[in-house]
Amino acid sequence: FLSAPRRAVVFQPVYIGYERLIEGKSYLDELSGQPKQKETIWALIKAAIEVLREHYGKVTVNFGEPIYLDDCLAKAAPNWREEIAGTENKFPWLAEMIGDLALQINVNINRAADVNPINLLAMALLSTPKHAMDENDLLAQLELSKRILNCEPYGPRITVTEMNAPSMITYGEEMGVVCRTKHPLGDVLSMQGETAVLQSYFRNNVLHLFSAAAWISLCFQN
């Protein structure tokens, strides 16, 4: 592109939101420090068969704000066209521009996140010592989290589930990520075992959306 910028180059950030990991076992293995296994055609076929047998919920695809390479180059070196004319030399500003571009792609992906019920359930339950909450407390936390997202959106491309808190809990139970323990004083909802570890993926995907509100809350607490 630098030597012959005939057509515009655009980087399109894309956020893909899941409700259940297809390669959950691989994710657990990587978290435990095991090396990533090489994928084979037979492994892919086996995985495809298993996917068809299970319910993995919905997948959401959001498109972030596109990034134009021309704009990045102009910001890094306003006279870049004149500088590169007739030379093959590397330029000191190029490496820094590539780093800035990579960062901006990640930022724009985060600004297009989708927040589904599994994300909110994971964020609420995994924040407790035993990954469990009284149902009424969980309902209140889910409603609060959703209200924060709707009142102070991280960006205009952020999408948030339309489910209310009771529907989120019911959906989490249907997806097999939330367990209910009956109790006369109020049911307890929890994430257990490997399920809780897997849900860290969904929690981590939306934590950045609450960072500003969390810092403000921390200031008041201290």
Language-model-detected regions and their locations in the chain:
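Membrane-interfacial terminal anchoring regions of lipid-handling membrane enzymes
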Residues: F1-N222
